[in-house]
């Protein structure tokens, strides 16, 4: 060690000398100083925290994802089973999975806030155009990770929602069918679909995101923060004020995520109930079953806007799907990539701000409409639709008969059409809610079967569910769909309130209590 270094280390403790040793060989102090003592135009502001919270959320996803990976088995016969193990048996697995699940949703919200802040502040203008384009690429990568992660539990909800999403890939002109087969891994959905989605979710997309993120941050360091004009406050350093604001925002994001996970459990405890921690956090549906349709299939809430938007083109067939799923979203992304150029026009920045707010507001409105369609029966007064329901059923839905029953009065016909539309919305909502309740029941039964002393057989949880008399019996009988045996036979306790209506509609014996002494006596009477 040189005399200068000896003098510098004189009087320092072991940690100080170790720090000097590392600094001599790495120069880390200069790097830390450059990172922390960057000038912030106009001083620290809360509006600058969104980029940092996004990086924090992504790092949380990486850490929790690696721990989940250690216990996850990506195959059609072991995926659901390994997620069941994580959720219900691994110590703290429910919390780990809950943080990963809800932090992914938080990232989508943070993306929207960060995009709004960048556009409002004009941080896409020269010389930051390339960094803005990189940000848009990062946004698409995050959404891709959210989409591919949906299938990995290999439950009914993720399986059927993924089928809808991948079918959209098939409508791309020329390359659509080949692209769909490439993503799915063959002509049918199965093991190769799952392994490809897992490779995308845990390997290719995160690695690509890290690469683009490094370049994004490097360009951000090169150009510095862009402050809204005019600047009314003096500049300050990144440390300590902006670092403190960023840290508070990160803690707030984690607090919200933990709150979403834990609040239901806290409510149960306050009510004096027993908390089953395996049912806290991210849900786990019944094992994916290609032979069983799933009427409650929906994308996650942040993709509901696209699901609802496609309904605008419902009557247009394949052309409508192509316009709604490919053309319109593609044009929106083109406009966003052109924002740095548009911003140079006289009113370009105002157009960019208005366009971005319009997209966010439109997505919010479409999401609200989708939720309203699914849950409107909870607040629609069915009694107010009684006359419309009676008329519709008597006329068999025939508009000519309905018009005749109303005396061909235009005002009455118009009013009745509105009521019939509400009636249809009510019935569709009821069907969705019934399917959701059935899905919850099936999921609870699957978890109950998997937790029995016999455990999950080598053939997998789906085989366990398929051989369960309690859940398969009603399906075979046709109780849920009103078909098969249930199309003729009733299955209702004769003493119940609804017995009279069901027995009157039945054309064959009531099979409630089949094989019991009471049933045989009733048959012989």
Predicted regions located by residue number:
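Short, non-transmembrane cytosolic segments of multipass membrane proteins
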Residues: 1-22
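Membrane-embedded alpha-helical bundles of multi-pass integral membrane proteins
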Residues: 38-47, 52-70, 82-100, 113-387
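Periplasmic/extracellular electron-transfer cofactor-ligation site
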Residues: 474-508
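Membrane-proximal N-terminal segments immediately preceding the first transmembrane helix
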Residues: 25-39
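Electrostatic cytochrome c docking/interface patches
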Residues: 398-408, 426, 440-480
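Alpha-helical transmembrane signal-anchor/signal-peptide segments
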Residues: 272-274, 375-396, 400, 411-446
